[in-house]
Amino acid sequence: MIVRTEPAFAISVDVEDYFQVQAFATRISREDWGSFPSRVIDNTERLLDLFDEAHAKGTFFVLGWVARRHPELVRHIASRGHEVASHGVTHRMITELSPAEFRAEAVESRLLLENLCGARVIGFRAPSYSVNRETLWALEVLRDSGYEYDSSIYPIRRRRYGYPDGPVVPARIAAGDRDIAEFPLPSVPLGPLRFPVLAGAYLRLLPTWVSLAAAEYHRLRRIPLVVNVHPWEIDPDQPTVGFSRLAKWTHYARLDRTDRILRRVLRLGRFSTIEARLRELALLPPVARTGAG
């Protein structure tokens, strides 16, 4: 039996640039990504400094496209004591990929990141949290591709993503004829449903008191929690891309408040990497990380 003296809180960052978000995918082709001014290095550096202020260590799910163009960023994240994990290569949702295509991205991104950071990469997060009932096959692919945990399941019901029947707390779940550790994104009960909190737009757009209350809900009940943010979400000065009113509001609203909310949430507990928390919860073997091999 595990006796905890504090809740298992983790913090994660999906390292992608502002022009790579799913909401813009129908308007900005991947072939044009290189024509946009990149802001991911400076924004990630700001998050690293913010984490240092809070004495927090985090898991950085780095997009392969970003790693190829900014290899020094991956090395710097690792050198500051944070976990490097995979966010795929092209930011295509798993629902858009065949099993073979997904396997190729999973392997390519893992090897790329391991080569850059000099440590094993064992964690994965799908773009737009796109592991759902129809894409559970991806978990078996991840296990076969050398990963030990996933953090893609959002146990909510949304149009583009969500797996309402998925786990609401970290667990080992089926991955073909084996299993894999899963650290789901955070939600709180709201009647018969689950309400998303503390991740991406939900951290930024919901009233601050809701985010703080959600974190306190987890803390008081000692429910494991992973907070998630993107580097572009702390950048109110990023270029404005002209799309639909809803897409623009969802992307650009309240970018000037994300860092303040993060600071307040991070004061509620000691935040560490997803890998560390899964090991503490005995969902991964309690062994030290080794160099890539």
What are the roles of these predicted feature ranges?
Residues 18-23, 191-193, 236-241:
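Short acidic/His/Gly/Ser-rich catalytic and metal-binding motifs that mark active-site loops
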Residues 30-38, 61-63, 90-102, 127-130, ...:
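The substrate-binding groove and active-site-proximal loops of carbohydrate-active enzymes
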Residues 2-83:
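Active-site beta->alpha N-cap acidic-glycine motif
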Residues 12-15, 85, 125, 228:
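Generic enzyme active-site microenvironment
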Residues 54, 205-293:
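C-terminal domain-boundary segment and adjacent tail
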Residues 54-135, 147, 152-159, 178, ...:
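Metal-dependent polysaccharide deacetylase catalytic core of the NodB/CE4 family, i.e.
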Residues 44-48, 71-75, 103-110, 139, ...:
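Generic structural signal for well-ordered alpha-helices
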Residues 2-3, 119-122, 126-228:
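Active-site-adjacent pocket scaffolds in enzyme catalytic domains
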